[in-house]
């Protein structure tokens, strides 16, 4: 019986059961295809009531995180059986803060080896629980998660499901990531792979099934107002380059290398690597970062006004991901640029009409042209030109009309600004 069928049967007849409640935390339950042996739904419900909740270790790797470690640990301290911090010999107060405020947290030490997977796998070696969950020091575990992660582990353990678990991670921009792969069973089958942008994989490098779960974590590590993004990116790009040397055809590393080049303001090189990544996805079964590569490439092409290539890759994006609304965003942006170009052409045409020797039967001052020209330049946000043209108008009534229009616009803008909270 499929897990999704079990869920639907529970919803129909046992919606008040603990099993249904805990299964409801699995967001993409309909995607799990493996069959599960079931005697009866009633026996499942009864068996789950008697089942044990597995223990969970929370693992954190740190180096000089004195500004953030307290908030991070406070957010997780009550939801896990064991917390292990692996410190790479911090030179700030990170360790002192942990020892003083979190005496139950186990601290291990390991020199930094330029390999995030090595550090995470070390924590796996130290962990004594049945499951492990990883959080970063720049993450906050939502208060709304209280007790949920144990329920997730319990229900997956009950059905003997081997998988990785992904909470939602909310970025400082508000964007939610769902493919985050933070928790898995400690049965020796899963280890981290990759010196950077690491992820848990099976021992044969295949990808475990990924369950998205209804938990939320907040990530602030890439907020430019609070972090040195360039420094972090320079560290990452060196490690990504090492992974590229090891796996030169892997589109994942080509994508991340391109993304990091972009963050270092090297967009021409970034575009080349993103194109290589997209091309290589044709040869790989793992398509997870395909959409990310396409969207970033389209963004860079739009910024550089390369509409020929943008249209080409937009077609690929629309074909591969027909439900991705960003296709409409990019096509709207292209139309907006086209409209702005047409407005500019119209403005230039009127400028010529103002300076040539043809006469006007409407008004020999040609102020009526200037009225249109002002409207065009307001839309183009060419304010110096608006000021210049306004000074050339001879009709006082038209000047008053324009001044009132601008005053009303300013009033409306100020009203909007008051409603924007930052």
UniProtKB/Swiss-Prot annotation:
This is SPbeta prophage-derived glycosyltransferase SunS. The keyword Amino-acid biosynthesis does not apply. It comes from Bacillus subtilis (strain 168). GO terms for biological process: bacteriocin biosynthetic process; protein S-linked glycosylation via cysteine. Its EC number is 2.4.1.-. It is an enzyme of class 2 (transferase). Keywords: Glycosyltransferase, Transferase. GO terms for molecular function: glycosyltransferase activity; UDP-glycosyltransferase activity. Belongs to the glycosyltransferase 2 family.
